[in-house]
C-alpha cells in the first residue's frame, strides 16, 4: 500500500480527492491521508457493495451509497458524482464508512449462521426449515434475504471481513464474542455437513465413493475462495473418501483438493458413487434427469445441502434423501 500511496502522491494535481473503494480495515483512510504528506490532496472512503454474480445490477442499482470523509466539502464533491443515481447517499466519517462495509458482511454471515443453527434444530425436532424461514421472512423486520440453509458460508468477503472486525475490536480492547462465536459455529456447521456424508454411506463399504456437484462458494461465480463446498470436501479427503466433483466453472485439478477428481459432466461425476452431495445451488442441476443419476449410482444416497430438490420427489425416483433442515 505504501508504494501505491507514494505513486499517487507524486502524480495527483492540487486539490485532488483520492477515493478508496476497497474494503479496508478501520483507520485506513486516516493512515492514507497521513502517508500522502500533501495538504492539498484529500482521502474519501466510498466502499462498494457489489456481490458476486450480481455485480452489474448492484452497480447500476445500488441500495445505498456511503461516503466517508473528514470534511463536508470533500464528501459533497464525491456525492455530486452520484447525483443522477437513484439511491440514498449516506455521508459519514472515515471510520463509520469503513465500519459500515465490515458490519454489513459480518451481519449477513451471522444471519446465515443463525439459519443454519435453526436448520439443525429443525432436523432434531421434525420441523422444516423452509416453512420456518417463510414464516419469519414475511416479518419486515427480518426479511427473506440470506435465509437459505446451506453447508456453511464462505467466499471472498464474509470470512475475511468477519475476522477483520473481530481483530479491530480486539485492538481496541473489546472482545466481540458474538462475532467470534459466529465464525466458530460456521466451522462446526461445516464439520456437521461432512459428518452427514459419513453417516449416509454404509460403514461396511471400504472404497467409499462420493460425488459432489458444485465447488464454487455460491452459484453465479467461479470464485472458490473459502468455498464451503471445498471446505467440506477437504474434510472428506482427510477421511480417505474417493471423491469426484463437478462444477460448470471448474476444469482440471484443484490445488485445494489434490485428491479430488474433476469430472467433465454431472452424470459422469455421479456414476458408481455411494453418495451425491449437492454443495452449490447451480440452476443447471435442476434440469438434470435425476432418475438416470440414481440408477447410475452404486448406492443412491443424496445429500442436498442447498435444498435444490424436493424430498418426496427424490425419494419417489429411488434416492435416500437428506436435505438441510428438512
Walk through the language-model features, giving the residues of each:
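Structural/interface elements that position substrates and couple domains in central-metabolism enzymes
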Residues: 1-326
Amino acid at each position: 500500500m505504501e508504494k501505491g500511496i507514494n505513486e499517487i502522491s507524486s502524480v495527483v494535481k492540487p486539490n485532488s480527492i483520492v477515493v478508496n473503494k476497497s474494503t479496508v480495515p478501520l483507520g485506513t483512510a486516516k493512515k492514507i491521508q497521513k502517508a500522502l504528506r500533501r495538504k492539498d490532496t484529500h482521502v474519501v472512503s466510498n466502499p462498494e457493495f457489489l456481490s458476486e454474480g450480481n455485480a452489474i445490477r448492484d452497480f447500476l442499482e445500488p441500495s445505498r451509497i456511503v461516503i466517508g470523509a473528514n470534511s463536508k466539502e470533500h464528501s459533497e464533491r464525491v456525492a455530486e458524482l452520484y447525483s443522477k443515481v437513484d439511491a440514498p447517499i449516506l455521508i459519514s466519517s472515515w471510520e463509520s464508512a469503513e465500519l459500515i462495509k465490515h458490519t454489513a458482511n459480518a451481519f449477513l454471515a451471522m444471519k446465515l449462521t443463525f439459519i443454519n443453527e435453526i436448520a439443525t434444530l429443525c432436523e432434531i425436532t421434525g420441523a422444516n426449515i423452509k416453512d420456518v424461514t417463510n414464516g419469519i421472512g414475511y416479518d419486515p423486520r427480518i426479511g427473506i434475504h440470506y435465509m437459505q440453509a446451506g453447508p456453511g458460508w464462505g467466499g471472498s468477503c464474509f470470512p475475511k471481513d468477519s475476522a477483520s472486525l473481530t481483530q479491530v475490536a480486539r485492538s481496541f480492547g473489546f472482545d466481540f464474542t458474538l462475532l467470534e462465536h459466529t465464525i466458530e459455529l460456521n466451522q462446526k456447521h461445516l464439520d456437521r455437513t461432512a459428518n452427514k456424508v459419513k453417516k449416509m454411506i454404509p460403514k461396511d463399504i471400504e472404497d467409499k465413493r462420493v460425488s459432489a456437484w458444485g465447488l464454487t462458494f455460491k452459484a453465479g461465480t467461479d470464485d472458490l475462495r473459502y468455498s464451503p463446498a471445498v471446505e467440506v470436501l477437504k474434510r472428506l479427503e482427510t477421511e480417505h473418501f474417493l471423491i469426484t466433483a463437478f462444477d460448470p466453472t471448474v476444469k482440471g485439478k484443484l490445488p485445494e483438493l489434490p485428491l479430488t477428481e474433476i469430472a467433465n459432466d454431472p452424470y459422469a461425476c455421479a456414476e458408481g458413487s455411494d453418495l451425491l452431495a449437492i454443495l452449490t445451488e447451480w440452476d443447471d442441476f435442476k434440469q438434470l434427469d435425476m432418475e438416470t443419476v440414481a440408477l447410475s449410482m452404486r448406492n443412491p444416497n443424496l445429500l442436498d445441502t442447498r435444498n435444490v430438490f424436493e424430498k418426496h420427489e427424490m425419494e419417489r425416483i429411488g434416492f435416500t434423501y437428506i436435505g438441510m433442515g428438512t
